[in-house]
Amino acid sequence: MFTPLITHDSDGTALAAPIDAARRNGATYKTRTIDDLRIKDDRLRAAIEGTGHLLFDGGMGTMLQAAGMKAGALPELLNFEEPQVITDIQRQYVEAGCDVITANTFGANAHKLDGAATVADVFAAAVACAREAGARYVAGDIGPIGALLRPLGTLSFDEAYDLFAEEVRAGVAAGVDLFIIETMTDLAEIKAAVLACRENSDLPVFATMTFEEDGRTFLGTSPEVAAITLDAIGADVLGINCSQGPAELRGLAARMLTVTDKPVMVQANAGLPHVDDDGNTVFDIQAPEYAEAVAGMIADGVSVVGGCCGTTPAHMAVLRTLIDNHTPSPRHRKPSMSVTSAQTVVDLPCDGHKIAVIGERINPTGKKRLQQALRDGDLDYVVSQGISQQEQGADILDVNVGLPEIDEVKIIQQATEQLQGSTLLPLQIDSTDPAAVEAAVRRYAGKPIINSVNGKQQIMDEIFPLVAHYGTNVVGLTLDEGGIPDTAEARFAIAERIVAEAARYGIGPDRILIDCLVMTASTNQRQAEQILRAMSLCKERLGVKCALGVSNISFGLPARPLLGSVFLAAAFGAGLDAPIMNPGSKRFMDTVYSYRVLSVEDEGSTGYIERYAGWTDPYKIAANPAAAQAASTDAAPAAGTAGADGNDDPIRHMVVSGRKGEIAAETERLLADHDAMDLINNHFIPALDEVGVLFDQGKFFLPQLMASAEAARVGFDTIKRLMPAGEIADKGKICVATVKGDIHDIGKNIVKMLLDNYGYTVFDLGRDVDPQEVLKTVKERDIKLVGLSALMTTTVVAMEETIKLLHTEVPGVKIIVGGAVLTPEYAKQIGADYYAKDAAESARIAEEVFGQ
């Protein structure tokens, strides 16, 4: 019998580390396998193993709309109010041949229900409807909470987890056969949902994310990042739902198939929505065309299919015929070590040699400025160290905040959260405290590295359960109870023991980085050779990747970068994959870029040429002391840092890098000899415009956009506080609202924040807003621009009604619309003046409307 993970003490106090709770239960953290699952029958088992197909049902919202559901009705309440309507729709899907019927619980979390019903009652009623319809398998449906997680919003990871766990327990009690987590755009949110499923049930977990036209989720996650992360944290089947039509999703699914061995599923929309002559929302892909596109995905290796918005029982019936005539083919994928943030993958293939630089600067050892920042809780300084290392060429950031006098569990959570909001790089969580390690990796959006485990049995007993449960990578140090051995063979023996112990937890060598531990040449000169030999042995015999803290080799010697760079080159020759080093060291990075050419990692030498075009040999200009000194500077600014591109504006750099900690003081300093509007128009607004360009180019994603907007807000607030009332011009008044019947307001909230930070006065009417309330605000406040948001296809009717009312009563008002179900064409059909694909586009439209 499965025992749910206890995450709170009897008095309700949350436990700092869930692994402690697992141990209280007598549970063991390990990599979950199919044998750990409660699977209803062999057909479902075959689908989870990837040897059989499975057919989910299609759209529910559009079917409810066709059945006459009123605009603004909460679909989950229909399980009580009109259960026969739900059952009739689901019976049509059963008769069409669907294996899985999705319970009508998509929005059945406590946040969305908001007291309208209990989570347990909704799940019980919804599952009863699906059983009444004759479902072979009933899936408990878990959708987004409807609130942004930190650092973009106010909802914590733990609060999200608790909301999902309540749904999971309700689903188990109601008798679901599996869980489907769907329509997620935030990697942290879907991770919380998967963990809630795993830790509160032993049922199979299917998990899908929704992608925009640019191939990324709303928050910038790619299909590869999604698949790697969902695989790592224990989803049994993973994939894509909603988003676009099946033809558009085929390429995204194919990208997932290259990075995971788990079964991949797709539930596409029936194309794009539009309004027919009768005012109904309809979709443009009919059943035969839908099946033709899905057939291509099945040929690629997708084994679980179904439908989303606009699909009907007719669409599913043709898919039934399709999969009945096909057997999944075995998939063969080359293993690799993958480390991810929410937006970036660093991939180290097992059959090749690729270099990933791990930045070492976020470590308080020997760094008084960082030590003081940690004592003061100055995480802005920590973030600045991460940003500078990203700009200097690091691929991964090591994060160590260990000081004896601070609360490491608390600080490492905050540091990783803020770093993920400001940089794109994956993180390596570096701590000797298992509670701190778990606090960080549990809440981390992506697949990180844990630094580290070693050959001591106690350490392996503490760390490997975390690596297994959270699906992370891990660094293994070649030391044990006897210390660091002198010989290569003894170091290898410890590494071999670490790899063998990891295997007991289901952790393969493709998730292990062995660090043979660099000793300083000043006192252990003969050790350099042993270190390199040990690394070669590990690579040849264990199939692992190798890391080294290369800076240690030169400690206590002059010209440290010179000696260190030569050792780094030798280590690359011995098979080093991940040097842990200072990317601000020019000599070290010169060695990295040069080796990437020689190892053919940098094909065509494009990266090398881009970096060194116009390079001057420092040895040839040694006769000129000033030039020689400049050429040999070891930590010249990297491209993108303040001063490197000729732009020394500190406001620009703080806004672009999303650093809000020091911007208030800098703004106050500049106000001493700058006009307030000059500061806004010539410093803040150009910086925000630059961020918008980076966002459009795909170099920034929503977390970075919002971090920059928050930094600008701090600066604007400082100006408003210090300047006399009326001195700062009002750029214009804007009203934003989520339309009647729709309770999803994440996108609207992001637009509001960005427009606020551009200097507009924004009136936020909230969610589920009646058209008359929007009209009243527009008239009373003399609003010139209105932003309307809708996520659900069933609420676009309310959006159209609001637009017609505004244009009739206030002809001069302009209206922007946005939301997952909208397209430029659809927006035009319902009468909107503008369509905004994202928050940055909303800011550009506002500038056009107000002539700024």
Positions of predicted regions on the chain:
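Domain-level signal for soluble alpha/beta catalytic cores
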Residues: M1-L513, M519-Q852
